[in-house]
């Protein structure tokens, strides 16, 4: 593997300059309320023929270029995912997994589950020590790694729906890895923030901390080993990852470091086509991901509860109180009842029904908070997103993850990528809080060999009341994915915000237990926060991270693409 540090030379500048918006145009900058953290709202990119919104501007441009060359939404989203594995190693991945929601122009919708699975050697209490404490092994190091699903998933969606040759959609990522790209400030910050953890693992430190320090903004990053891995995938499809040289290197790393993933685990991995969940909110149709993602069920339950109330003014105490109470109830069900449908029987029809939502509304007081501990379950539990709309009106929302930034921190020597730490998304011990801040209850998401761990990923497509494509969105950000997607949808439909304003708007988050509300800086006016505290809500301020949404909306002006200011990027279209 080779890497090169340099300050921008002519070659570096030409490489960076090659990735500029095609014929998409930006509207004028607008101002949101001055109290918002992101008060200067960057304009959406507007294009007539196709749009890509991803968490890195290079990834967005790769997808837009595929559309311009005649590729469809699936071609573009596969190309974006592979490019993202190069330019966003902290989150973009081939060592993780994810979910796709895809709607064809004619109206048929599909969902693909390529979530990681527990290795065959995994055991129920593998992260609980002799004192009953959950160890760090669930999120850091080789024992946190699940069997990767990304390459199998990307291959399968392209096999079924892609138009361009497979090699053509992988080729941009190969070029980026081989020729290099300029590291920007946000990605340099991510590396610097993970420096101490990366130092613990020699293969990761050797490449990502050359000379003992991380790459900095302005350096050019070349990844020869990753380019070679992508060449194998381009030549052989999923077989080029799950068998042969790449698989051998993954297994060798597992043996060297003490991980559990074996040759048989890799050979036996399969993605699964599932039926998307569908619901309605104030006349709009919501198409979203079913379990093993918890995102779709939790989103639909929350929207169904909200549908019984008239919207209050955005940011008011009444508005924020209701949101907190709805999130509390939807997450309580999520954390106790949901899991892998191959292992767990779930009451999905009930949880997503309007009758159940009405029952939940009867437990909500509009004048005070309901402590989560007082709610009984009603019996009968680093990510990235890409949104694409092509010229034919096909729409795709894809969310992938390796969980934390740089996943397990285990870097596959000679292959050039990080492996996930998704085993932390299982319930290591009922009642324990995982590193995403979720206290999971019961056994629905317990560790079992071959089982898919519960996810919060929420790729979603929204149709307007006349059945026309309206909105395509998703998010990264752990448990906050669900509430970010929920709030953007409600901001658009209930508060009639333009898409950019809906994404930029301040957010709050409650995942039932622990019983406290996360808030962005300046998310609540002081008098609103005081009123909510008097009602019994408890807040903590999260200054760093609050999920990042990528979204596309169909408007009279064309396709609007918006990315989230919380991790700077840009959409691209033509």
Description of each model-found segment:
Residues 86-111, 260-262, 395-465, 499:
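Active-site rim segments in enzyme catalytic domains, especially the processed small/beta chain
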Residues 27-61, 73-237, 241-243, 248-290, ...:
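Noncatalytic scaffold domains of N-terminal-nucleophile
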Residues 22-26:
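Sec/Tat signal peptide C-region and signal peptidase I cleavage site
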Residues 273, 380-383, 405, 455-457:
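Short, small/polar residue-rich loop motifs at catalytic or cofactor-binding pockets
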Residues 9-21:
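Bacterial N-terminal signal peptides
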Residues 451, 485-486, 494-544:
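Extended C-terminal subregions enriched in glycine
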Residues 66-67, 152-160, 236-243, 248, ...:
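Alpha-helical support elements that line or immediately flank enzyme active sites
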Residues 309-402, 411-415, 422, 430-432, ...:
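Internal maturation/activation junctions in enzymes
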């Amino acid at each position: 593997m080779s890497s090169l540090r340099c300050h921008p030379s002519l070659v570096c500048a030409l490489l960076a300059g090659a990735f500029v918006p095609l014929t998409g145009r930006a509207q004028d900058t607008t101002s949101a309320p001055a109290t918002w953290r992101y008060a200067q709202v960057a304009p959406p990119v507007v294009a007539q023929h196709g749009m890509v919104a991803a968490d890195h501007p290079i990834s967005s441009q790769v997808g837009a270029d595929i559309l311009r060359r005649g590729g469809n939404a699936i071609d573009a989203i596969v190309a974006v995912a592979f490019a993202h594995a190069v330019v966003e190693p902290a989150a973009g991945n081939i060592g993780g997994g994810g979910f796709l929601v895809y709607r064809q122009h004619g109206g048929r919708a599909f969902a693909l589950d390529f979530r990681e699975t527990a290795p065959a050697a995994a055991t129920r209490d593998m992260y609980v020590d002799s004192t009953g404490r959950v160890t760090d092994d669930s999120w850091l190091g080789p024992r946190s790694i699940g069997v990767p699903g990304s390459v199998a998933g990307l291959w399968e969606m392209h096999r079924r729906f892609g138009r361009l040759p497979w090699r053509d959609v992988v080729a941009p990522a190969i070029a980026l890895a081989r020729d290099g790209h300029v590291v920007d400030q946000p990605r340099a910050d991510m590396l610097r923030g993970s420096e101490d953890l990366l130092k613990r693992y020699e293969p990761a430190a050797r490449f990502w901390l050359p000379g003992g320090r991380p790459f900095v903004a302005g350096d050019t990053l070349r990844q020869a080993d990753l380019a070679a891995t992508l060449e194998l995938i381009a030549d052989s499809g999923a077989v080029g990852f799950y068998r042969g040289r790449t698989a051998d290197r993954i297994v060798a790393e597992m043996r060297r470091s003490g991980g559990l993933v074996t040759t048989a685990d890799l050979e036996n991995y399969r993605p699964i086509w599932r039926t998307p969940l569908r619901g309605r909110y104030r006349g709009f149709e919501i198409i979203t991901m079913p379990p093993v993602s918890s995102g779709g069920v939790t989103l639909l339950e929350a929207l169904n509860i909200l549908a019984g109330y008239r919207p209050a003014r955005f940011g008011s105490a009444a508005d924020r109180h209701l949101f907190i109470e709805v999130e509390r109830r939807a997450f309580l069900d999520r954390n106790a009842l949901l899991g892998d449908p191959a292992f767990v029987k779930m009451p999905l029809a009930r949880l997503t029904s309007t009758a159940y939502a009405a029952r939940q509304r009867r437990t909500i007081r509009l004048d005070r908070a309901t402590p989560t501990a007082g709610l009984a379950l009603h019996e009968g539990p680093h990510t990235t997103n890409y949104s694409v709309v092509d010229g034919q009106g096909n729409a795709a929302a894809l969310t992938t993850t390796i969980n934390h930034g740089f996943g397990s921190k285990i870097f596959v020597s000679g292959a050039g990528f990080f492996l996930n730490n998704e085993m932390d998304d299982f319930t290591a011990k009922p009642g324990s809080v995982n590193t995403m801040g979720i206290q999971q209850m019961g056994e629905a998401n317990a560790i079992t060999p071959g089982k898919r761990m519960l996810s919060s990923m929420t790729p979603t497509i929204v149709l307007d009341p006349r059945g026309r494509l309206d909105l395509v969105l998703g998010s990264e950000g752990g448990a906050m994915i669900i509430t970010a997607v929920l709030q953007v949808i409600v901001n658009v439909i209930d508060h009639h915000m333009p898409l950019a304003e809906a994404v930029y708007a301040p957010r709050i988050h409650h995942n039932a237990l622990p019983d406290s509300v996360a808030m962005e800086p300046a998310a609540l006016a002081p008098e609103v926060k005081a009123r909510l505290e008097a009602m019994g809500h408890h807040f903590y301020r999260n200054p760093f991270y609050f999920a990042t949404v990528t979204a596309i909306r169909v408007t009279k002006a064309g396709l609007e693409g918006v990315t989230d200011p919380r991790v700077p990027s840009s959409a691209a279209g033509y």
